[in-house]
Regions:
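Short, thiol/selenol-centered motifs that function as redox-active sites or metal-ligating centers
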Residues: 34, 56-65, 103
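A short interface-forming secondary-structure element
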Residues: 43, 47-48, 52-61
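Alpha-helical support elements that line or immediately flank enzyme active sites
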Residues: 61, 65-76
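Short beta-strand elements
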Residues: 31, 36-46
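C-terminal binding/interaction regions
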Residues: 1-21, 26-27, 37, 50, ...
Length: 128
């Protein structure tokens, strides 16, 4: 498959790879069809994403999408985080081949699950 320079840049030089020692939340998503796995760690401060890291075991566009979302979500509120779409990821990459759309969808599913986990953890911090 032929990927854009932007996809290849994020694959060869992924941003924000790794784990966060004391995250506000951690989520892991697996694509049941192809087996790609994306794990996200996040820290929230003052209602915004202060730090976001990822690890991905998957295809070129899955790694690239994981890298891209860590940059795109930085500094965003939880509502803004959950509003990121697969279409935005694909547009940022100048498109993806049809067989690779699963990569942007996996990244968005992980972001949505992360947003839910962060909302839940914030409710727990507030107490009854």
């Amino acid at each position: 498959m032929i990927y854009s320079e932007k996809v290849l840049e994020h694959f060869h030089h992924p941003r924000n790879v790794g784990e966060i020692e004391r995250p506000s939340a951690v989520v892991e998503m697996t694509n049941p069809v192809c087996g790609d796995v994306l794990k996200l760690w996040a820290v929230v401060e003052d209602g915004r994403i202060a730090e976001l890291k990822f690890k991905c075991e998957g295809c070129i566009p899955a790694v690239a999408a994981g890298s891209w979302v860590t940059e795109a979500a930085h500094g965003k509120s939880l509502d803004e985080l959950m509003a990121i779409t697969a279409r935005q990821i694909e547009a940022a990459f100048g498109g993806l081949p049809p067989a690779s759309h699963h990569a942007s969808e996996l990244a968005v599913a992980a972001l949505k699950r992360l947003g839910q986990a962060l909302r839940h953890s914030q409710r727990d911090d507030v107490g009854p």
